[in-house]
Amino acid sequence: MADNLVIVESPAKAKTIEKYLGKKYKVIASMGHVRDLPRSQMGVDTEDNYEPKYITIRGKGPVVKELKKHAKKAKNVFLASDPDREGEAIAWHLSKILELEDSKENRVVFNEITKDAVKESFKNPREIEMNLVDAQQARRILDRLVGYNISPVLWKKVKKGLSAGRVQSVALRLVIDRENEIRNFKPEEYWTIEGEFRYKKSKFNAKFLHYKNKPFKLKTKKDVEKITAALDGDQFEITNVTKKEKTRNPANPFTTSTLQQEAARKLNFKARKTMMVAQQLYEGIDLKKQGTIGLITYMRTDSTRISDTAKVEAKQYITDKYGESYTSKRKASGKQGDQDAHEAIRPSSTMRTPDDMKSFLTKDQYRLYKLIWERFVASQMAPAILDTVSLDITQGDIKFRANGQTIKFKGFMTLYVETKDDSDSEKENKLPKLEQGDKVTATQIEPAQHYTQPPPRYTEARLVKTLEELKIGRPSTYAPTIDTIQKRNYVKLESKRFVPTELGEIVHEQVKEYFPEIIDVEFTVNMETLLDKIAEGDITWRKVIDGFFSSFKQDVERAEEEMEKIEIKDEPAGEDCEICGSPMVIKMGRYGKFMACSNFPDCRNTKAIVKSIGVKCPKCNDGDVVERKSKKNRVFYGCSKYPECDFISWDKPIGRDCPKCNQYLVENKKGKTTQVICSNCDYKEAAQK
């Protein structure tokens, strides 16, 4: 039996660490939290200074029994849960269950799961930091008080299964506020004039800028006609040439929030998927002869700090690969409000390149690792240098301007460009070499009518970014928050953008009227600040809870008395039940909308809502191909005669047969491109627009 017992959260992490520590250490997993507040009751005694009642989580009995058995036999027990508040709380709960000494230096933390980092952490064990535990306890108790007080009111007055919470209610508010902006938006007409100009054999474009040396707004067609009427022929003169050198710095390495945003934009990953794959990379990948190694640092962080060791290694890689001129000379600065002493998300070793790791990784693991690796290495590279040119092109009182840009030195852009910045403005726009006084010819003057557009709906990436900018919640809360408002059917995704549902708007209105603090951004931000102060030891968690609950309790009492019951009418489905003849209605279930008999519970008939795509089933030639959704909300295509016909396709059949093998053709989408391919052979053709 090993003298030392080490407890971590997951089997994958346990497996990796045990290989590093050797035979004197036994590493086992707690499988996450082992204690929590009970689900069947509040679990917080508001009459006894908010004392929490912790119980062993249902189903964790065998795990706890196993932990106690090993702890009894070990000389030393080390708690090696994750290096954040949640991990500190897990360590504390384990310490209580195993009856370890409070003052024992048995807590070990490491930011990356590599041999050196793990061994070093065991040389410096410390006591459990109760300030961090208390900050996590305060968050948990706050969320319990909010959820278990508001939810029953919503169940009683609106509909069963609803919920509200400090972060999810603010996230829902953001989506609804944006929708109201869009509804209330009044488009305004405006015009632009673009000119195409020729100098010798070169052509370039410029936009109308000034009339009589002043900006002139083109609000109507009359304004445009005033400008075009003032033009005299096609000859223009270059009246000013401005040349500048512009430096562009690389983005910082990833935090949790920026990783979720960039993975959504570049890889089309949902926040939850990003965190799941990142956890796999952090906990350890089997590299065969090299053993199991954690490929990235801890993925729940809002710090952009980088260790000196990592900087040195990155500089060495960049120098060897690109040359000395590509290494960064600037000093990276941390972000205000970084939680604890974490690092940014980075590869545990720059020398483990994505290409070298590809054969050991799944497709998703490789794509995310490549993104993290490239972003980090680019952050340690030299800035890009751009040459910009601005030309003023004048005829009389009318001035056009052309802007051009060329890359003089690519620097970090050799490796990586952040998606949000990868726009038209960054693309090289070469202008002919012109000097003041040169003459150019206008080959085309093109007015165009436009209308102002409403603000766009939130994508998942933009919602995460906004939550972070407003300091709502923590990096670890973004993914579950977005998950919750979708599962509750408060919002739905349309073209990858969030739209509030009728139910979401009803719930929001009730919470807004009776629990205004819960959806108040400033209140939520202040609460996060107080949680930080608890972690720093500046205030007690009980004082923070009491400051909130004393007024919140009155809001709950008022809501119970005054909130009116809301009837959410079922939407008619437009057809009758084939069993009893009663009208069918649209219901919302766990996996979306479905049809149910209005005569429930006497008749329990239900049907999936299907949408015909106007194509006959290629298998039975009798049914129609209909669009369906899987339990994971992924669209697929099946036969309307199911279960008699079991035809299924992830790609959309188009109603034509392959000219090579006579099997059915499908529409296949990859990223932004769509093509028609054969479901059987290698035939393909361009999709018709």
Swiss-Prot record:
<dbReference type="GO" id="GO:0003917">
    <property type="term" value="F:DNA topoisomerase type I (single strand cut, ATP-independent) activity"/>
</dbReference>
<dbReference type="InterPro" id="IPR028612">
    <property type="entry name" value="Topoisom_1_IA"/>
</dbReference>
<feature type="site" description="Interaction with DNA">
    <location>
        <position position="139"/>
    </location>
</feature>
<feature type="zinc finger region" description="C4-type 2">
    <location>
        <begin position="617"/>
        <end position="645"/>
    </location>
</feature>
<feature type="region of interest" description="Interaction with DNA">
    <location>
        <begin position="163"/>
        <end position="168"/>
    </location>
</feature>
<dbReference type="InterPro" id="IPR005733">
    <property type="entry name" value="TopoI_bac-type"/>
</dbReference>
<feature type="site" description="Interaction with DNA">
    <location>
        <position position="300"/>
    </location>
</feature>
<dbReference type="InterPro" id="IPR013825">
    <property type="entry name" value="Topo_IA_cen_sub2"/>
</dbReference>
<feature type="site" description="Interaction with DNA">
    <location>
        <position position="140"/>
    </location>
</feature>
<keyword id="KW-0460">Magnesium</keyword>
<feature type="domain" description="Topo IA-type catalytic">
    <location>
        <begin position="129"/>
        <end position="557"/>
    </location>
</feature>
<feature type="active site" description="O-(5'-phospho-DNA)-tyrosine intermediate">
    <location>
        <position position="298"/>
    </location>
</feature>
<comment type="function">
    <text>Releases the supercoiling and torsional tension of DNA, which is introduced during the DNA replication and transcription, by transiently cleaving and rejoining one strand of the DNA duplex. Introduces a single-strand break via transesterification at a target site in duplex DNA. The scissile phosphodiester is attacked by the catalytic tyrosine of the enzyme, resulting in the formation of a DNA-(5'-phosphotyrosyl)-enzyme intermediate and the expulsion of a 3'-OH DNA strand. The free DNA strand then undergoes passage around the unbroken strand, thus removing DNA supercoils.</text>
</comment>
<dbReference type="GO" id="GO:0005694">
    <property type="term" value="C:chromosome"/>
</dbReference>
<dbReference type="InterPro" id="IPR013498">
    <property type="entry name" value="Topo_IA_Znf"/>
</dbReference>
<feature type="site" description="Interaction with DNA">
    <location>
        <position position="488"/>
    </location>
</feature>
<dbReference type="Pfam" id="PF01751">
    <property type="entry name" value="Toprim"/>
</dbReference>
<feature type="site" description="Interaction with DNA">
    <location>
        <position position="148"/>
    </location>
</feature>
<dbReference type="InterPro" id="IPR000380">
    <property type="entry name" value="Topo_IA"/>
</dbReference>
<dbReference type="InterPro" id="IPR013826">
    <property type="entry name" value="Topo_IA_cen_sub3"/>
</dbReference>
<dbReference type="InterPro" id="IPR023405">
    <property type="entry name" value="Topo_IA_core_domain"/>
</dbReference>
<feature type="zinc finger region" description="C4-type 3">
    <location>
        <begin position="658"/>
        <end position="681"/>
    </location>
</feature>
<feature type="zinc finger region" description="C4-type 1">
    <location>
        <begin position="577"/>
        <end position="603"/>
    </location>
</feature>
<dbReference type="GO" id="GO:0006265">
    <property type="term" value="P:DNA topological change"/>
</dbReference>
<comment type="similarity">
    <text>Belongs to the type IA topoisomerase family.</text>
</comment>
<dbReference type="Pfam" id="PF01131">
    <property type="entry name" value="Topoisom_bac"/>
</dbReference>
<keyword id="KW-0677">Repeat</keyword>
<feature type="binding site">
    <location>
        <position position="9"/>
    </location>
    <ligand>
        <name>Mg(2+)</name>
    </ligand>
</feature>
<dbReference type="InterPro" id="IPR013497">
    <property type="entry name" value="Topo_IA_cen"/>
</dbReference>
<dbReference type="GO" id="GO:0008270">
    <property type="term" value="F:zinc ion binding"/>
</dbReference>
<dbReference type="InterPro" id="IPR003601">
    <property type="entry name" value="Topo_IA_2"/>
</dbReference>
<feature type="region of interest" description="Disordered">
    <location>
        <begin position="328"/>
        <end position="356"/>
    </location>
</feature>
<feature type="binding site">
    <location>
        <position position="82"/>
    </location>
    <ligand>
        <name>Mg(2+)</name>
    </ligand>
</feature>
<comment type="subunit">
    <text>Monomer.</text>
</comment>
<keyword id="KW-0862">Zinc</keyword>
<keyword id="KW-0799">Topoisomerase</keyword>
<dbReference type="InterPro" id="IPR003602">
    <property type="entry name" value="Topo_IA_DNA-bd_dom"/>
</dbReference>
<dbReference type="InterPro" id="IPR034149">
    <property type="entry name" value="TOPRIM_TopoI"/>
</dbReference>
<feature type="domain" description="Toprim">
    <location>
        <begin position="3"/>
        <end position="113"/>
    </location>
</feature>
<feature type="site" description="Interaction with DNA">
    <location>
        <position position="155"/>
    </location>
</feature>
<dbReference type="InterPro" id="IPR023406">
    <property type="entry name" value="Topo_IA_AS"/>
</dbReference>
<dbReference type="InterPro" id="IPR006171">
    <property type="entry name" value="TOPRIM_dom"/>
</dbReference>
